[in-house]
Amino acid sequence: NLMQFELLIMKVAGRSGIVWYSDYGCFCGKGGHGRPQDATDRCCFVHDCCYGKVTECDPKMDFYRYSSNNGDIVCEANNPCTKEICECDKAAAICFRDNKDTYDNKYWNIPMEGCQEESEPC
């Protein structure tokens, strides 16, 4: 669920998902249209695509289980659908961490008019 995603981002990337990623670029926080503006926005685009492939449960609401083993996140496999959600969130959190250096404040809270291009396929 979204609260778990926030906690996972904090654990992996060391920053708040709500503060840093809830309104960034064309895909972080608002659903998504257009083309990703940078590597961070692409993390959100890929995350949106990943959530789009989850059909048997609700990625924004359903609870999943994971553990941390020497800093690595391990999604539990008790329920295949919630494991999928966990894997989506884990990949995004790692992507945010790996692209911290490219984060650009100019993409924070950009007007949606800047996101009108046709979206690329997932």
Swiss-Prot record:
Function: Snake venom phospholipase A2 (PLA2) that inhibits platelet aggregation induced by ADP, arachidonic acid and PAF. Acts in a enzymatic independent manner on a proteinase-activated receptor (PAR1, F2R) to evoke calcium release through the inositol 1,4,5-trisphosphate receptor (ITPR1, IP3R) and induces mouse aorta contraction. PAR1, phospholipase C and IP3R inhibitors suppress PA2-induced aorta contraction. PLA2 catalyzes the calcium-dependent hydrolysis of the 2-acyl groups in 3-sn-phosphoglycerides.
Activity regulation, per record: Preincubation with heparin slightly increase the enzymatic activity.
Primary localization: secreted
A GO BP annotation: lipid catabolic process
Note: Hemolytic and neurotoxic activities are not detected.
Tissue distribution of the protein: Expressed by the venom gland.
Localization terms from the record: Secreted
Pfam families: Phospholip_A2_1
Organism per entry: Trimeresurus stejnegeri (Chinese green tree viper)
Subunit text: Monomer (predominant). Non-covalently linked homodimers are also observed.
Protein's name according to its UniProt entry: Acidic phospholipase A2 5
GO cellular component: extracellular region
